[in-house]
Amino acid sequence: MRKVYYNLALKLTLFLPVFLSGDIALRPCAAQQQASLKASALESHEGMTISVRPWTDPALYKEKFHKKSPYAAGMVAVQVNFRNDSDDSMKVNLERIRLNVTLSDEERQAIDSLTSEQAADVILKPGAKNIGKSRFPIPIGGPKVGRDKKWTEVEEELRQAGVRASVIAPHSSVEGLLYFDVRSQFELLSNSKLYVPDIVALEKNHGLMFFEIDLGQAGAQ
């Protein structure tokens, strides 16, 4: 049975220790970890817990990205932590993760997560944006741009901050950022869910039930 926990809803407070694994995980201090978890939406079942926190505060991007901010380019970074409490290694198919956005009662859209290369292309694309213009539906993918030294520096920052491993060892966790191009429509996040459809317990060769985590339940950050 799937269990969904939101640590800011129904007066329920969850305190989850974060065990970061080696050089594949981000290493925030204990106070930052606790603040992050308090602002996260979580879902847990079958030994896997996924916590997510959308970054909607531009200051967070300034601390992490010194070259170019994904936020300024209309993207949202979603901090995600995969915690494996089982005795089996878990493999997450990062390429299949989506941001499911509810535009209206009758209209929904799935937005692909971007690789660091795709995100760098979006950040460095030429031309001014017309933020006031309606952007429905949100296009899939981004333009190809020249990949010079500047592009390489931007891509490296995005890659270093991203989720850098898809296999989570038993009783460990992996944390990083996922990137979604919402074309500066950050208000959509209150009606969005992070959809993680493909996680496999490797030794048992058993697929887990999908995760669908409501970003509207995460605290504003």
What are these regions (language model features)?
Residues 1-7:
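N-terminal secretory signal peptides that target proteins for export/translocation
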Residues 3, 14-18, 210:
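Intrinsic disorder/low-structure terminal segments
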